[in-house]
Regions:
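Conserved NTPase motor "head" modules and their coupling/switch loops across ABC/AAA+ ATPases, GTPases
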Residues: 2-121, 130-134, 138-141, 147, ...
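Walker B catalytic acidic pair
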Residues: 125-127
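Conserved beta-strand scaffold positions in the cores of enzyme catalytic domains, especially
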Residues: 148, 166-168
C-alpha cells in the first residue's frame, strides 16, 4: 500500500499537466488512491501500516472463509480518476476516458525516465484511430525519445511522425 500510494502521489503530480495539454486546456484530471482496508494514511511507513493491515485481516478472516474469497488486499484497492471533478468511470465519454488513460501512460513513462534516465519501450495499439487530429499530433509530439511501437490501420495517421520507421504487416506477415 505504501509504495502504491507513493507512486500515485507521483502520478498526481505528473499526469494532470499532461492531461490538461492533451485536452487542449479544457479538462482537469485528478487521481485518488483508495484502499478497502482501514488505513487512514496510505503514505505512512510500512512499519506503521503493518499492524493496521494485520488487524484488518484478523477482523475479516471469518467473512473471507465464509465467502471463499479474499475480500481485502491490494487487489481490491483502486485508483479513482476524475475529470473536472466527476468520475471518469461513471461520467466520462469514451474520448475522455481514452485521453485520461493515455495521460496516465505518458506520465508513467516520464516518471520511469526521470528515475532511470532511460525511456521505457512504449507500446500503443491503434491509439491514433480514436483521436482527433489535434490529439494525434499531441501524442506524436509527446512520445519523442525512446523506442515506441504504434500499431495503426491508416498509414496517413503517421505522417507527422519524424525519425520513425513504418513496417507493413499483411495477413500476419511483414511485407
Amino acid at each position: 500500500i505504501h509504495y502504491r500510494a507513493h507512486f500515485v502521489k507521483r502520478l498526481q503530480e505528473a499526469a494532470p499537466p499532461i492531461h490538461r495539454d492533451f485536452s487542449g486546456g479544457g479538462e482537469e484530471l485528478s487521481l485518488t488512491y483508495t484502499t478497502v482496508s482501514n488505513i487512514p494514511d496510505p503514505l505512512a511507513s510500512p512499519k506503521e501500516l503493518l499492524p493496521l493491515l494485520l488487524d484488518h485481516q484478523a477482523r475479516h478472516k471469518q467473512a473471507e472463509l465464509d465467502s471463499r474469497q479474499c475480500l481485502s488486499g491490494p487487489h481490491k484497492d483502486d485508483l479513482l480518476v476524475d475529470i473536472n471533478g466527476l468520475s471518469a468511470k461513471t461520467y466520462g465519454s469514451q474520448g475522455q476516458t481514452r485521453t485520461a488513460a493515455l495521460s496516465l501512460k505518458l506520465a508513467q513513462r516520464e516518471i520511469f525516465q526521470a528515475e532511470t534516465e532511460e525511456w521505457p519501450v512504449l507500446l500503443l495499439d491503434d491509439v491514433l484511430s480514436e483521436l482527433d487530429s489535434r490529439r494525434q499530433a499531441f501524442i506524436l509530439n509527446r512520445i519523442r525519445g525512446g523506442q515506441v511501437f504504434i500499431t495503426c490501420c491508416e498509414e496517413e495517421k503517421l505522417e507527422g511522425l519524424e525519425g520513425g520507421k513504418a513496417f507493413h504487416v499483411q495477413g500476419g506477415s511483414l511485407i
